[in-house]
């Protein structure tokens, strides 16, 4: 009885692995957005090292752009 249960669980797990395999592409790469432009792109100020990516900017900083979802590119006020 235990052997048939093990075979069932193995087949069950194998089924979900096969279902999750992409059809002819790398997993998720067709949906990812690359860096120049897009939701996960870092703004130019932060990319050049003039700012920092944070959830909220501190009082002495201003928002210079977006780093990724829910993150601002914060730069010192002049």
UniProtKB/Swiss-Prot annotation:
Disulfide bonds: 46-73, 53-67, 57-74
Tissue/organ expression: Only expressed in epididymis (caput, corpus and cauda).
Signal peptide (residue range): 1-27
GO cellular component terms attached to this protein's record: extracellular region
KW Secreted (keyword) present: yes
Sorted UniProt keywords: Antibiotic, Antimicrobial, Defensin, Disulfide bond, Secreted, Signal
Localization: Secreted
GO biological process, one term: innate immune response
Superkingdom, taxonomy of origin: Eukaryota
InterPro entries noted in UniProt: Beta_defensin_dom
Family: Belongs to the beta-defensin family.
Biological role stated in the UniProt entry: Has antibacterial activity.
Protein name as catalogued: Beta-defensin 12
Protein's organism: Mus musculus (Mouse)
């Amino acid at each position: 009885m235990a052997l048939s249960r093990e075979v069932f669980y193995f087949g069950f797990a194998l089924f979900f692995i096969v279902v999750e395999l992409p059809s002819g592409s790398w997993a998720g790469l067709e949906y990812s957005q690359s860096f120049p432009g897009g939701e996960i792109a870092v703004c130019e100020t932060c990319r050049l090292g003039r700012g920092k990516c944070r959830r909220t900017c501190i009082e002495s900083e201003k928002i210079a752009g977006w780093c990724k979802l829910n993150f601002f590119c914060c730069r010192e006020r002049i």
